Amino acid sequence: MIPAFPTKKISAQILFLLTLANLVLAQNVASPAAEKPTPKMTYLLVGRLFDATGDGVKENMVIAVEDERIKSVTSAADLKIPPGANVIDLSQATVLPGLIDCHTHLGSRADRYNEIYHFKDTPFSHAFAGVVNARKTLEAGFTSVRDVGSNPFLAVDLRNSINEGYLVGPRIVASGPAISITGGHGDLNNYSPYVQMMMFPEERDYKIADGADQIRHVIRGQVKYGVDVIKIISTGGVLSRGDSPGAPQYTLEELKVAAETAHMAGRKIAAHAHGTQGIKNAILAGIDSIEHASLIDDEGIRLAKEHGTYLVMDIYNDDYILNEAPKYGLPVENLDKERMVGRLQRENFRKAFQAGVKMAFGTDAGVYPHGDNAKQFFYMVKFGMTPAQAIRAATSSAADLIGRSKDVGTIEAGKFADIIAVNADPLSDVRALEHVDFVMKGGVIYKDARPSMAHAGAN
């Protein structure tokens, strides 16, 4: 028998949870800039523009922003700015589209590896973390993210609160909890059954699914509660207990049902998959993106290219897990699993990219501290990409994966004015993106840390 979704209990709990989080943290996280939107028409004087429509840079450009969208992108020589217009001087900076991270967990903290937190933390802990992490992410230059697993429906509520202007954060493409088999990477394993029954009785109703009928039921229930994207777990994981990263956890037929059900509901679907067979099963099933893809083999690379499947490979966080997570109580079992897959993942990233597989930027933020997302660019360049290719993976390619190319991902007329700037050249040193000086989202400035913050009027 398929359990019914506990609609009233969950909805009331989440509403109360987010309301409390918002009330407590509003004074601390609200951005002063968010209260002062730019005037109706604003002109950005741009020294160097990487618009992500190609790999080149345009110099001495002007971006005209009207309300929340880009009105025009023009050579400075071809545009006469009206006297007294509002002008933002970025003539000494490199300007880029707002960055996109396709694999985040906004409700997670990177200092919560000790299993004791399963018992100490409450849903409020995750809500507070989500509010803070959303702002950190935006101020790091990531104006859009895809959240692929925050329990229970935290990302949905964060998305709504940000869209309503009540909280500060990036645009969020939100999933519900990652869907898992019983005893899989998304389940709570190696505890007494009484722990599950007493402490997490509702969790199974909207994330644990065994067999085709339960998969359909859970996906439809998540769509009912407002998710933008579905996340399903195809193989074991690194940070879970009692499973192997290489082992498949859903059959090919079950994954086909998941993809069909998600697509029927107008949602894309992402699959957590480290293991070789689980990766190939997910590709053959019609899943839109493979998360991690650590142990992908040559056949998997060929299949991904043939099917146009995106790989989202989080090749930075291996360093954080091995060097920092032990301080926060990560068990030896999980460290051993990370040692098994982390280095292989990086070499397979190189092979997949060289083979021409579609790649989108995603970091697993929450495994490491939110706000450090841009540290992954260095590793993407180290393992085969040019800086321009790595940036496009986090802009135009990422926008394509999350289904938002009409609005974000490049700097072009008609798109949202999601614009960042750095006072260095990231095409020469991609680590410049670790220090974003200027962030605009939807025409509103949320960060301005340029050495010269003068907003001069036009001559």
Annotate each predicted stretch with a short phrase.
Residues S31-A33, L49-V62, S75-A76, T386-I391, ...:
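Acidic, glycine-enriched loop/beta-strand segments at the rims
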Residues L49, T53-L96:
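Histidine-rich, glycine-flanked metal-binding segment
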Residues A93-Y166, I181-N190, E253, Q277, ...:
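Metal-associated gating/positioning segment near the N- to mid-region
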Residues S108-H126, R135, T182-R204, V238-L252, ...:
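Active-site gating loops and adjacent loop-to-helix segments of metal-dependent hydrolytic enzymes
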Residues A110-Y113, A155, H185, S240-G242, ...:
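Histidine/acidic-residue-rich catalytic or RNA/ligand-binding cores of hydrolases
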Residues H118, M264, K268, G329-E333, ...:
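His/Asp/Glu-enriched, well-ordered alpha-helical/loop segment
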Residues A129-A155, V168-A178, V227-S240, K268, ...:
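Divalent metal-dependent hydrolysis catalytic cores, especially in the metallo-beta-lactamase
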Residues N160, E164-A178, G246-A271, G308, ...:
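Alpha-helix-loop-beta-strand connector modules within alpha/beta enzyme cores
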